[in-house]
């Protein structure tokens, strides 16, 4: 092999893989958005033309006169690559009548939402858009930043990005951001460039210093084919080693191992863009200079013979509309199958939001993937919003509302309420603006919590329709070219998915219905029962923690999000919480049950009913207070157990936080998946495991994680003892680890006082009166009952 195991071990750090704060973001105010190191789209024609030809040999204008019978690994090249396509699509990506230029009828039903099957998309053609794609508007185009040039003109109605001529005159506008497909070639020279990477390659004038790569026992020329274009409005990329390719219409698959790796990206995005900064920086032409950049040009996996597929529309930093992104993933795979060849196996890989996508797509599109390797996992996005909302409500209570109470001055005590990890003495908080050894604004001593280090910034991003990072290139583009549209756009997770959740009939501004709810939640219940907090502290917490005001009433964020004035300090988004109303009992927030039902019906909730071999890789990041906590793989397993009664297809492999351990673990997972699928049964060595630094196996077996899913004392298996699993705020309130209750069923407070909910505690008449003020009308959560929003016919 050209690449050795020690080189694979030296792959990118976890930070580069995750990029949940964009591309190596350092600014804490950019949490969960994207940090664009590329230029803003919408530049002059001269600059975008240059951007599209700076690297590789573009074949966008190449034509093939050859006519051959399609064979495995090739496609029918009998087409020219001008703006008239042969698949019944126009250059703006819209579907036509399904009749090709040679008269062949291509009308077929597909599950991509289109009326025709428009694949393959050849060089010079623009990929299709599914008929039921909601075509969100505004929609920032990023093709120029990625290296595909200005997008195609698709309207003269001044909608979208203005497309400029040679003298910067406006020729038209692009709303759908289509770009013609192109293929670039790169190669590894015998003497690699300083810093590694590849060099541009011209297949019609090949250099004489191409390195050789051993694949399948044969030496192959190290030449990479890199195809990019737009499908379903998003930019896709497909790369594979193609040693002898000379015609982009006929992919050379002689070095392919017959496996497709679909790499899914993470991050938290709220839509209205073709690609976030994270996605741009994985698809740009110049990524050939970065040999270990996760994405389509990741050399270690190419060197093993994998073809790699990627799309800006399967990066959750772009959008969390998993209905749309799943549709896009299916279409990208169709392009691969039509242009290249149906793979023997398709493996999923991705961290964070990339892990979520694998689970959701295995559920909603079971034919897309054969094996899953989710890392830094969550069950889904929508049930994570529940915990995200709790974090700032609780931190504001600890810091401000009850900030004088010494109970909350230790981080360990806060953890008893939040459930997530917190560390007294933790150093290096991203939110320590004043260098005090703790997050600025905190009433506690030195230290921090996962609520802050992992989740701070997600509340304004996901919940406030008025706030968006206008410095991110996508949103700066919209603000520059369509300021009125920008001002009228609601920037929230739910509004990005308004076609799923529907418009809230109570909103005068047309905002989407929401799924967030904390009615009846008894924050800190477990801490109360274990004696960690007093009855008076429990009562005060639940009276004052509150919820969120209606989106119609929300105001712009303070410093450091919306306002740049430190005197307007509000890291908790407290101005948009009901605690700010100053009432004796701060009102809770109630979900729209119709929105919750749509979340289930439309496949946004991971239900656990999948049978794909799944190996969850969990870097143990609790000491870093990272948002990717150790509870999540076990929430996945619990949902599988609840759905199927077993989870034999699911493995949990924990590794250290050392970045060098990550990709070797992924390689082992791929080998295990291949053996599993080849034999059509689970290998005997496919077991739960945990490793320490250097990928040193510590323990494996069915009891390795004993205790992680139980509450029995002294029941921890060796892996659970090595890597402790924490909980979250709703588990502290009585929910189980599956974390899938949007709106709890409630029982009357009088019932709770009598049925043992409070253990052996006794309450005075004044204390009962105080509890009645909080929970008398709503009751308290009864987590023995299912989610009120879960449809009975699901």
Residue ranges and their predicted role:
Residues 18-113:
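Ser/Thr-rich, Pro/Gly/Ala-heavy low-complexity intrinsically disordered linkers and tails
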Residues 1-18:
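Sec-dependent bacterial lipoprotein signal peptides
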Residues 111-794:
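C-terminal His-loop and adjacent cap/lid subdomain of alpha/beta-hydrolase
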């Amino acid at each position: 092999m050209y690449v050795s195991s020690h080189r694979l071990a030296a792959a990118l750090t976890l930070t580069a893989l995750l990029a949940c704060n964009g591309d190596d973001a350092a600014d804490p105010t950019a949490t969960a958005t994207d940090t664009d190191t590329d230029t803003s789209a919408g530049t002059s024609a001269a600059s975008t033309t240059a951007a599209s030809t700076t690297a590789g040999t573009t074949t966008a204008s190449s034509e093939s006169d050859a006519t051959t019978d399609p064979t495995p690994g090739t496609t029918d090249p009998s087409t020219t690559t001008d703006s008239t396509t042969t698949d019944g699509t126009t250059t703006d990506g819209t579907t036509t009548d399904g009749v090709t230029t040679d008269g062949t009828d291509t009308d077929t039903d597909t599950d991509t939402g289109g009326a025709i099957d428009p694949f393959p998309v050849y060089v010079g053609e623009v990929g299709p858009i599914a008929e039921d794609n909601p075509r969100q508007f505004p929609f920032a185009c990023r093709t120029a930043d990625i290296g595909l040039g200005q997008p195609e003109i698709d309207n003269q109605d001044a909608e979208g990005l203005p497309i400029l001529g040679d003298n910067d005159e406006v020729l038209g506008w692009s709303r759908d951001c289509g770009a013609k497909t192109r293929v670039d070639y790169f190669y590894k020279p015998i003497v690699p460039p300083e810093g590694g990477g590849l060099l541009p390659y011209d297949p019609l004038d090949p250099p004489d210093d191409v390195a050789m790569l051993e694949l399948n026992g044969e030496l192959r020329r190290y030449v990479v084919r890199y195809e990019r274009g737009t499908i379903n409005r998003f930019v896709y990329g497909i790369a594979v080693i193609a040693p002898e390719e000379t015609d982009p219409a006929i992919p050379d698959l002689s070095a392919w191992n017959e496996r497709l790796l679909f790499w899914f990206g993470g991050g938290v995005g709220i839509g209205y863009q073709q690609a976030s900064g994270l996605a741009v920086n994985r698809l740009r032409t110049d990524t050939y200079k970065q040999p270990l950049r996760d994405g389509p040009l990741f050399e270690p996996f190419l060197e093993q013979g994998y073809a790699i597929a990627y799309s800006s529309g399967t990066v959750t930093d772009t959008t969390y509309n998993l209905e749309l992104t799943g549709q896009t993933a299916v279409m990208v795979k169709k392009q691969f199958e039509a242009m290249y060849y149906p793979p023997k196996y398709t493996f999923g890989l991705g961290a964070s939001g990339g892990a979520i996508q694998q689970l959701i797509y295995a559920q909603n599109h079971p034919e897309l993937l054969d094996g899953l390797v989710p890392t830094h996992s969550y069950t889904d996005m929508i049930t994570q919003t529940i915990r995200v909302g709790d974090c700032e409500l609780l931190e504001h209570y600890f810091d401000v509302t009850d900030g004088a109470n010494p109970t909350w001055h230790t981080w360990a005590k806060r953890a008893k309420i939040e459930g997530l990890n917190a560390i007294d003495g933790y150093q290096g908080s991203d939110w320590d603006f004043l260098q005090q050894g703790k997050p600025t604004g905190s009433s506690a001593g030195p230290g921090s919590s996962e609520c802050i280090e992992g989740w701070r910034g997600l509340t304004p991003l996901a919940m406030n329709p008025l706030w968006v990072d206008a410095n991110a290139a996508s949103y700066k583009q919209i603000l520059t070219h369509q300021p009125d549209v920008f001002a009228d756009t609601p920037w929230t997770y739910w509004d990005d998915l308004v076609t799923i959740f529907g418009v809230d009939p109570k909103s005068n501004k047309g905002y989407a219905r929401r799924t967030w709810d904390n009615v009846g939640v008894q924050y800190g219940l477990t801490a109360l029962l274990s004696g960690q907090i007093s009855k008076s502290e429990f009562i005060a917490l639940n009276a004052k923690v509150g919820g969120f005001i209606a989106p119609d009433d929300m105001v712009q964020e303070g410093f450091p999000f919306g306002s740049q004035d430190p005197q307007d300090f509000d890291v908790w988004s407290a101005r948009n919480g009901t605690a700010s109303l100053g009432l004796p009992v701060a009102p809770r927030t109630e979900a729209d049950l119709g929105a919750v039902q749509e979340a289930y019906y439309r496949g946004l909730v991971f239900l656990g009913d999948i049978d794909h071999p799944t190996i969850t890789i969990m870097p143990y990041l609790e000491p870093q207070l990272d948002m990717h906590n150790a509870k999540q793989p076990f929430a996945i397993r619990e949902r599988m157990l609840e759905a199927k009664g077993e989870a034999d297809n699911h493995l949990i492999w924990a590794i250290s936080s050392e970045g060098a351990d990550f990709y070797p673990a992924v390689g082992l997972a791929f080998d295990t998946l291949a053996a599993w699928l080849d034999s059509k049964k689970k290998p005997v060595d496919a077991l739960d495991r945990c490793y320490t630094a250097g990928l040193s196996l510590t323990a494996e077996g069915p009891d390795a994680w004993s205790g992680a899913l139980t509450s029995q004392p002294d029941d921890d298996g060796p892996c659970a003892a090595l890597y402790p699993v924490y909980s979250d705020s709703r588990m502290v309130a009585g929910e189980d680890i599956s974390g899938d209750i949007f709106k709890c069923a409630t029982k009357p407070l009088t019932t709770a006082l009598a049925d043992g909910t409070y253990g052996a505690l006794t309450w005075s008449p004044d204390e009962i009166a105080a509890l009645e003020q909080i929970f008398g009308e709503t009751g308290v959560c009864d987590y023995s009952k299912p989610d009120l929003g879960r449809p009975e016919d699901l």
